[in-house]
Amino acid sequence: MYSRIPVNLPQNSYEIAIASGSLSRLGAEMSTLNLGKKVLLVSNPEIYDYYGEIAVNSLKTAGFEVATHLIPEGEIYKTLDSITQIYDTAVENFLERSSTMIALGGGVVGDMTGFAAATWLRGISFVQVPTSLLAMIDAAIGGKTGVNHPKGKNLIGAFHQPRLVLIDPQVLKTLPPREFRAGMAEVIKYGVIWDANLFSQLEAAKKLDEFSDLDEDLLQTIITRSCQAKADVVSKDEKEAGLRAILNYGHTIGHGIESLTGYSQIIHGEGVAIGMVAAGTIAVKLQLWSEQEANRQDALIKKAGLPTEVPPNVNIEAIIEALQTDKKVKAGKVRFILPQQIGTVTITDQVTSDVIREVLAQIQSKA
């Protein structure tokens, strides 16, 4: 059964369609959008081996002409060089302004495909078909696209909304367990910043750290509620003028830790998990919420099999320095998203370097 969530924007509204087995109906879903017949499917080799044939057959059955472009897996390939290679394939296949790029993969594939679509011929349509939990509930929704710069994550990018986000939860069965757990960090984030009922549902679940632990109904509920939270926020603040910044809860310190560990020792969701622990601890110190609520959050993060400590090999001063290149810096001040209670957060630039330093030392692994 489909769950359909509208993302209502002043222009370029679209739908998130969620259903088991929906990948085989990709072509039929796209046929309703009045798109040109030429499409470029962008994926990575592993995902394409699993799901490329299903997607391509569905598109061809619906009358689309399909070209493909595969990019290596990993955050280290999220660069302008990789974007140029997508452009090369677009040239070779005569992609026009009426053509569409399709992202079949995780957040890296989605970010890069969206950025290529945003900039090819000054902007063509694209469709998100996320295959990781993290991409399904976060990266694929909201139109943020881009690549990394050697000095920081996602510093080069554009807002470019997809025409459709198609989510098939069953593709998660081939997702590596570590990647599934990384996605759960973003689910927990929505519970803390927006949806206290989702948080309670996660607390009530017996286990959260593996795909096989969740029955189909619970998985569909988690994905749907998370997507609804993201859609609600994006609909109210498309270009991150204010409210949308709350979606970066846990990301401020998390991004710094990711980049300092080469995007591999600590991957995105793990960085967010550590960042949420840090933000929750800062919020206790600033008396924004209680230690009891911070403990509930941290217990849920542990239940999802996620790290809660800064790795011992990461230099705290280097994290503080990395915060200065964060996208949320305004007038030289780092803006933090801090919880006030489960389901509600606030944005502040009043967190001093001394407090950050103290909290990071407190939550750094001593091993």
Swiss-Prot record:
Q: Which UniProt keywords apply?
A: Amino-acid biosynthesis, Aromatic amino acid biosynthesis, Cobalt, Cytoplasm, Lyase, Metal-binding, NAD, Nucleotide-binding, Zinc
EC id: 4.2.3.4
Which reactions is this enzyme annotated as catalysing? Answer: 7-phospho-2-dehydro-3-deoxy-D-arabino-heptonate = 3-dehydroquinate + phosphate
What subcellular compartments does it reside in?
Cytoplasm
Q: Does the keyword NAD apply?
A: yes
Q: How is the cofactor bound?
A: Binds 1 divalent metal cation per subunit. Can use either Co(2+) or Zn(2+).
Keyword Amino-acid biosynthesis found: yes
Q: In which pathway does it act?
A: Metabolic intermediate biosynthesis; chorismate biosynthesis; chorismate from D-erythrose 4-phosphate and phosphoenolpyruvate: step 2/7
**A Pfam family that the UniProt record links to this protein:** DHQ_synthase
EC class: lyase
Q: Indicate which residues the UniProt annotation says bind Zn(2+).
A: E186, H251, H268
Q: Which GO terms describe its cellular component?
A: cytoplasm
Question: Per the UniProt entry, what is one GO biological process?
Answer: aromatic amino acid family biosynthetic process
Cofactor names from the entry are: Co(2+); Zn(2+); NAD(+)
Function statement = Catalyzes the conversion of 3-deoxy-D-arabino-heptulosonate 7-phosphate (DAHP) to dehydroquinate (DHQ).
Family membership noted in the UniProt record: Belongs to the sugar phosphate cyclases superfamily. Dehydroquinate synthase family.
- What's the name of the protein? 3-dehydroquinate synthase
Q: Which organism is it from?
A: Gloeothece citriformis (strain PCC 7424) (Cyanothece sp. (strain PCC 7424))
